[in-house]
Amino acid sequence: MLTNTKPDEKIFQKNSTTGSYWITTFGCQMNKADSERMAGTLEKMGYTRADNELNADLVLYNTCTIRDNAEQKVYSFLGRQAKRKHKTPSLKLVVAGCLAQQEGESLLRRVPELDLVMGPQHVNNLENLLGKVDLGNQVAATEENFISEDITSARRESSICGWVNIIYGCNERCSYCVVPSVRGKEQSRYPNAIKSEIQKLAGDNFKEITLLGQNIDAYGRDLPGTTKEGRKENTLTDLLYYIHDVKGIRRIRFATSHPRYFSKRLIQACYELDKVCEHFHIPFQSGNDEILKQMSRGYTIKKYKNIIENIRSLMPDASITADAIVAFPGETEKQYQDTLKLITEIGFDQVNTAAYSPRPNTPAAVWSNQLSEEVKKARLQEINDLVEKTARSRNKRYINNIESVLIEGLNPKNSSQIMGRTRTNRLTFVEIPKNIDFNFSLGDEIDVRINETRPFSLTGELYL
């Protein structure tokens, strides 16, 4: 077994065996972007994408550990593949991502059929690690690693909308969150490297980019440079101005934001820069200040409301989405009701909700005031019902509006419709006109009159 080998330790020239591969991705947008990069590496090595995981010569699970149910799903998938490997010993079985980082070598002991366990900081090192596997080693790569600016060419899932990582890791210490221990410290990419990647995407006819970071407002804190006024000059705001002139890119998004660092200057930039879309994903997690303090979030509900007010004062129709956790340890009924009240007051377009799940090596996991599964289930159901009701009400404002929709493809459930997204990130289905000659290409922007709404999508017709 080789464990925690140095990233630059070259013990092979070229992988001797390739074949087909399959990647299953669990979790967040960061994982999706990492999976695209690993797929690009595998195809550069000579692998081809399998039609399903049961036919693949290499199966890779890019995992999430933010909640227990995400972990259990991975172990279920691994169990099936472990049985398959007994029948097909040549199968390569890889676990990447946050669960791999959290469990490390213990995952190799739990699932001895695994060939490679690699944390998210080793995405760029996949080829070298597989070379070590080819030499007959079982490999764990979970040591802290500097993430190279030499971003591997990704195999993009979309040909129109591209993920662009701008900062890795997280320096926050929220009491419930395992991310800092599995994603590592913040590492910002340099602006010129980011812009070069975006220019390449534009050259490949991409029309939209989403800048990604676990805590994207922290971008640049670890980079050198200050202005004459003493302000950091490499911030997310500065980056938006810097990349805005890339020709061919029509839309710019970013996620995920932290309320502690969401500034008026950033809001002003989003208002001034035409390509930056009017969609803001800003998790609030709880509507109660005492719970926020116990979560170590570093802001109050008053501050959060001020952020939303500042956004809507400049962009009244902006879409506001968020994350929320219910049944945090010790959360009283009154504190929980404060969260429901905030959802109603703000009028979110969408909220990703979860019941609290204890995570290893986090302070809240060992607190004695854990709530019962019954309470968790009831509160999660109630908040989900409210989120859907609020989203349904919010979407009604689009009726009869003319919205610009970026075409992403055909509706997979209805071939008579094309689908895309508005600038506010509303999924929109558009009936293909039958009475006129209508030709479209992926990446076209079309005007759509909205005539029907659902909680999380819109339907409309081409507006000529």
UniProtKB/Swiss-Prot annotation:
Keyword check for Zinc, yes or no.
no
Q: Which GO terms describe its molecular function?
A: 4 iron, 4 sulfur cluster binding; metal ion binding; methylthiotransferase activity
Q: Which residues form the MTTase N-terminal domain?
A: 19-135
What cofactor does this one take? [4Fe-4S] cluster
Q: Any binding details for the cofactor?
A: Binds 2 [4Fe-4S] clusters. One cluster is coordinated with 3 cysteines and an exchangeable S-adenosyl-L-methionine.
PROSITE patterns given for it?
MTTASE_N, MTTASE_RADICAL, RADICAL_SAM, TRAM
What does the record give as EC number?
Answer: 2.8.4.3
One BP term from GO: tRNA methylthiolation
Instruction: Please list the residues that bind [4Fe-4S] cluster 2.
Output: C170, C174, C177
Task: Give the transmembrane ranges.
Answer: none
Residue ranges occupied by any Radical SAM core domain in the UniProt entry: 156-394
Gene3D superfamilies, sorted: Methylthiotransferase, N-terminal domain, tm_1862 like domain
What is its biological role?
Catalyzes the methylthiolation of N6-(dimethylallyl)adenosine (i(6)A), leading to the formation of 2-methylthio-N6-(dimethylallyl)adenosine (ms(2)i(6)A) at position 37 in tRNAs that read codons beginning with uridine.
The entry's family comment says: Belongs to the methylthiotransferase family. MiaB subfamily.
- Put simply, this protein is called tRNA-2-methylthio-N(6)-dimethylallyladenosine synthase
